[in-house]
């Protein structure tokens, strides 16, 4: 950041490789102390970290590398926790919607979701418990970010409720559930769920016996099956 005095700390931080999921929190939001309630108890060196985020000169300058590193780590944590609150506001949601539409968070790897854009989500609101995941609003599942540079971002910096708040505010943006579902088949026939039930806890020999029994129970040629499933569930 020292190479350009005109770039704010927030812009610099969000521009770092691996921080592409973050949006830039408005400084006015950060300057409102009500929005920061309780964070001073969660973040070490809170005052110095806040001054760094807002590009303010610290009251007491400790010129040593160790202290600077600690303040930078605290600033990252503080900004992340502020960010989790900010993206639940109308302004924050609008910024994240733009990033979502630009596919900044990637698309769902599930084939039948047809490249549905995903949203970042935390599995915990407590810092240090879980890394950020990606939520697909179409199949309603979560995935590990594809790029390794995003796999070390704390999930609490996005929170557990962000995607759901976005769709409460913009219900028109919620995609429809996939029309097509994958259907497992064997030799062209659909596999009935019952076919897997008898295999649990059986050894290879028992499985072979089950197959033999199933073959003996199949309908002889020339007779009507009456629409019943055989032991394979086909």
From Swiss-Prot:
Tissue expr: Expressed in a subset of the adult male sensory neurons: CEM head neurons, ray RnB neurons, and hook HOB tail neurons.
PROSITE patterns recorded: CK2_BETA
Modified residues (Phosphoserine): 2
Entry coiled-coil feature ranges: none
Top-level taxonomic group: Eukaryota
Key words, A-Z: Behavior, Cell projection, Cilium, Phosphoprotein, Wnt signaling pathway
SMART domains in UniProt: CK_II_beta
GO terms for biological process, alphabetical: response to hermaphrodite contact; vulval location; Wnt signaling pathway
One of the Pfam families matching this protein, by short name: CK_II_beta
Cross-referenced PANTHER family: CASEIN KINASE II SUBUNIT BETA
Descriptive protein name: Casein kinase II subunit beta
Species name: Caenorhabditis elegans
Annotated gene: kin-10
